[in-house]
Amino acid sequence: MFEKSVEELTELGAQITTAEIAQQPELWRDTLNIYRENKEAIEAFLAEARAMGEGRLSVVFTGAGTSDYVGDTCAPYLRHAGNTDLYDFKPIATTDIVSAPRDFLRDEDPTLVVSFARSGNSPESLAAVAVAKELVHNVKFLNITCGPEGKLAVESADDPNALTLLIPRANDKGFAMTGSYSCMTLLSTLIFDTASDEQKAEWVETIAKMGEEVISREPEIADYLAGDFNRVTYLGSGSFGGLAQESQLKILELAHGLVATSYDTSMGYRHGPKSFVDDKTLVFVFVNNDAYTRQYDIDILNEIGGDEIAQHTIAVQQEGATVYEGESFTFKGYEALPEGYLALPFVMFAQAISLLNSVRVGNTPDTPSPTGTVNRVVKGVTIHPFTA
């Protein structure tokens, strides 16, 4: 797909999505520059947020669908790489905040709501902000969005309690969130990671090179899809649990449900969900670089591979002291990356799988919902009035 002409891709209904997957390494470098250019404003805003009360500031990462999985991906990493003396990181979907506010927000907790949104126009994004303002006594809003003209950015422009950071080049035009997911994940990680800016820059350059490698290894990725399969499952631990959920959603969306999907944590999969696996199932496991966690990822790979039921059991991993010795997509020759950054080249692998599979089943990746019942920006949501 990545070597096809624009004309060939257009005929397949895949030109937009293919280009948006391929451009991500460049966008990650851009995102690093956005972080650098806004660092002073970010630090000043976070200082104001911390001043709202004593103790740790509740940092709520929120979004819907893929935007929700941004928080699910970065929060586990930041719970040990961020400053947890100052911040309590919590991923909570906008759909949960809006539908049951008191179950997820505490009125007395000083709170920073970090909203992730591609367009900034989904009803839940806007309603979550309104609900938080109504319920929480001391609250500020950090908006990370790709839509400069979206309602989230426009309506918060004059709000002294809000800071909006824009990643406009990541505002995907295709149906699926690809660059928007990876860039919002990266920017939030850069903001709260306590590593030095020099170290962050090195990690960003490494993931950009790994992303470029994903594109060049497309034939290898395509080989995993050569057989007759109708199920795909993704597993991962820590931050890769959120990544697994995002990866299975991409398969589901781009194939319009023609391939069944599941996801879980590496350890959780044994507790019932493993029943999903049959001889027409592809199992992908994202292998963590943390030496302790990695053992559990490799354990489930060895177990499922040893069962000899799944059509393929594939590790997505970086070369390390221990690796899965069975089928794998392995990145070699790079420094070992922490999970908050390694998630990005890993998701490019998953996006490539989803793109190739969409075409395999005869669907059009750029417009995968032929009935129009699933939309790029969610429609048909009724937001009911809320009073604290």
Predicted regions and their residues:
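Phosphate-moiety recognition in structured ligand-binding domains
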Residues: 2-18, 25-26, 30, 157-161, ...
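Active-site phosphate/pyrophosphate-binding segments
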Residues: 20, 31-50, 54, 157-284, ...
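Glycine-rich phosphate-binding loops that contact phosphosugars or nucleotide phosphates
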Residues: 53-205, 237, 286-325, 329
